[in-house]
């Protein structure tokens, strides 16, 4: 089977550092190849080049992983599906300009690989999607890539590993002595003087994440966060916000959920 996977084209695949969607696409492609499938990764911002690459490869199936390319969906004459990785998909009140893309999904009604049941319900309730077009397919992780230690080097340290931005809310927690941060910074409110480790490479992620006791992810919006799966692969527990709970069994002792009402009083 020949499969085309379409990425955003905004950074390399595989990424050198930050880039969850790009990492997912790379791991997905390699997993499919291991199963004997022929896989094409298309990673360009030019929609005409996307369509040309699909035509040349002549795949049996096309998987689009970039919401903006919903406009290409009617122009692809192959079996196909979309996956949205938009962090606020379960929070319509936070969509802002994304609502235009969401409305396009409603208009076109593509097949959608939903990252959680919650996301599936959003499409059903807000866009009246037919059930047969929605498929729940949570993210996975390449567990073989991660170093694992029974005894971490820093068991009393927690790691906040994510792009430092408004959605992830790192600035609210940067004065916690036991919390360390890694990720590229796009939030000017964050002070790099406090336990900041810079932007980790993929090699650092695979090797060093296991050295910490827990992963912290207290975003105000998530789809199905890859970094949580990476934390599990490296042997960490997780401390999460209500918005990062997708696909998790909250009865597990290594998963701690902080209610939103307590987010601003953490010390």
Locations of regions flagged by a protein language model:
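Active-site proximal beta-strand in glycosyltransferases
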Residues: 3-4, 61-64, 74-92, 112-113
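A short, active-site helix/loop in glycosyltransferases that binds the activated sugar's phosphate group
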Residues: 92, 107-133, 141
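Acidic anion/phosphate-binding donor-loop and adjacent secondary structure
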Residues: 92-94, 124, 138-156
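Conserved donor-binding/catalytic core segment of Leloir-type glycosyltransferases
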Residues: 113, 150-168, 174-180
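Short beta-strand->alpha-helix junction loop in the catalytic core
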Residues: 118-119, 137-146, 185-187
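Aromatic "clamp/platform" in nucleotide-sugar-dependent glycosyltransferases that forms part
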Residues: 220
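Short hydrophobic beta-strand element within catalytic cores of glycosyltransferases
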Residues: 237-241, 247
């Amino acid at each position: 089977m020949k499969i085309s996977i379409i990425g955003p084209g905004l950074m390399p695949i595989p990424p050198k550092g930050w880039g969850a969607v790009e990492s997912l696409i790379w791991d997905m492609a390699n997993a499919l190849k291991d199963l004997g499938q022929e896989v094409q990764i298309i990673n360009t911002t030019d929609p005409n080049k996307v369509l040309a690459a699909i035509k040349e490869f002549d795949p049996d199936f096309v998987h689009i992983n970039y919401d903006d390319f919903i406009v290409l969906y009617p122009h692809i004459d192959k079996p196909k599906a979309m996956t949205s990785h938009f962090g606020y998909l379960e929070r319509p009140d936070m969509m802002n300009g994304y609502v235009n893309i969401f409305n396009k999904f409603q208009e076109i009604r593509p097949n959608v690989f939903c990252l959680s049941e919650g996301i599936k319900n959003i499409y059903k309730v807000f866009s009246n999607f037919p059930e047969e077009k929605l498929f729940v397919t949570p993210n996975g992780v390449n567990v073989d890539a991660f170093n694992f230690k029974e005894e971490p080097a820093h068991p009393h340290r927690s790691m906040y590993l994510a792009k430092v931005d408004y959605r992830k809310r790192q600035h609210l927690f940067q004065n916690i002595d036991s919390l360390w941060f890694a990720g590229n910074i796009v939030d000017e409110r964050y002070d790099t003087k406090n336990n900041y480790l810079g932007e980790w490479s993929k090699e650092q992620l695979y090797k060093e994440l296991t050295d910490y006791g827990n992963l912290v992810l207290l975003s105000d919006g998530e789809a199905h966060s890859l970094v949580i799966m990476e934390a599990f692969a490296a042997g960490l527990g997780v401390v999460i916000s209500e918005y990062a709970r997708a696909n998790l069994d909250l009865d597990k002792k290594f998963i701690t959920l902080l209610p939103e009402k307590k987010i601003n009083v953490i010390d």
